[in-house]
């Protein structure tokens, strides 16, 4: 079929590169030793059948994408050397199989943030190749954010002349970068080094065409009304305050520099921009962001207040809704469909708009009940760590290992079949605040994109973790040939300490079933490690080392410490009670000897939002004490801060307390998550009750939430 020529050519060209064997593409029938491609529109959309026999390979596909995916399946049946860029001598054998397949979901995507860090066109094209290999069909191109405008708009050249460039602070962690002056580059003699880049319209045309040939739709994202400081830096008149600002080099929170919703100039600008964008991107969908706007400028702006009065809008949330609906009307008039993050529902939303759900399934369910199509992404943020943070490159504060992503289900039990049908699919989101180069990007993408590909293609009843992880390890050999710098976090040993009725056990596991885990306690070197079979009973404090072996250590050596102390198993009371979102293991959390990790969602942390906290520990009998340690977390990208003051008071009767130690901890900006045991020492004395007072920072230096997280109280 002539419509399948392009996909046949893609396969033939790669096979020739890898094997040196040319596969001619012919329209006329041949009798033996051929690959036949036939269209059968009765098959499900993007579906195919693949039959491999000794004399022929037959492919019947529903459409272009179906044929493409059949050939991608054939690619994976061929030896891994198929991925070579130079000819390799090997046995190019394919097992005899019959496969019939079709995707469960229409939207199988990847979002790549190129604003926070810019990635060259060549890397985008490579990423599209890799998406096609995994049968992903939607590339969400995050082209605009505060930290950089990445697409040429001919009517507004300053968007790339100014908005695409910022002061180079790449030597600093994202959350430690300082604000930039609007005049930073005015004087060439004193101007700092620039960081940035953008895609010309010719680049965009090439990317879109390249994607289309691989069955991928490119959906551009042009953020509004917030995440637009790069545009406001170029054209200050677009804001309410009209002040010149610099393009930020790092974290901005809260986002108060947003487009003015009260002036017509803003909508003229956005319609002009979107008109050029739509000329470049033929996709049905146009993403407009719509998230994380702080409306303080709208509340002060006379034009915004006049707009609210004229349109009978009761608050700034309804003004945000007006803003999004107006852009929606414009896109609909051009035959396109608006997509936005789930904040676009605030204040009401047209039923045709697509909601990209990121704030949890309950918000997604609300969108479905309103009749909106939904893309579920809340548990697919691959900017989060995929292994223990101490052994991983810098990432966002969350934790999303391969196994967790694989078990993400789009089949929600609390949804009716009618609502379930409105789930378009899912995508992985790779935000790039901490991802500064292509190797780091590859590391975050692989192997997690394999899991994303399976959960967006396959129904839950056909998923099998053991099979998947075995296939993943085999697929890693293919990634090696492709020279992809993927993560090996699945081989990382994950230690947990369990308190079973007062008995303490060290449990070691990793994501690979039946892995050969070896461990050593205390000063024993890892070379003399013991094979792990079952949880290790402990009766005293110890350090440990553990790794996975395959003839030798296959990954980073995980280290840790278990500390025994006088408060284990003792009762703790809390004032106020910890937040319902972060309840750890309940009341016993802080005295169970089990320590939290840098993953604040690991179930071992108690959290308080904005509160000062008083903890009261009952040791059950008078005990000689001289030191109290409080385990705390600082993860400022997630709004978590160390307490700024600690106080220890002792009592023998639970009524009369005497303060014995205090400590003040300055609140400083930290770019990485940090764990610390704050040790308060005092003269040895008897006490049964210990009162620990913790002061919350309440107003962080960069704004936002002020969480206080504690995992253990240790008494000596």
What residue spans do the PLM features occupy?
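Contiguous, structured surface segment used for ligand recognition
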Residues: 1-105, 440, 456-467, 473-478, ...
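Substrate-binding cleft of carbohydrate-active enzyme catalytic domains
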Residues: 105-336
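Flexible loop/turn segments at secondary-structure boundaries
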Residues: 3, 118-120, 146-152, 225-231, ...
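Surface-exposed loop/turn motifs at beta-strand-loop junctions within extracellular Ig-like
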Residues: 63, 548-552, 696-698
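Structured core elements
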Residues: 111, 140-142, 217-221, 260, ...
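Short, compositionally stereotyped local motifs that mark structural "simplifiers"
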Residues: 38, 459, 463-614, 633
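Aromatic, loop-rich ligand-recognition surfaces of beta-strand-rich domains
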Residues: 597-661, 665, 672-716
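Flexible, acidic glycine-rich loops studded with aromatic residues
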Residues: 338-353, 359-505
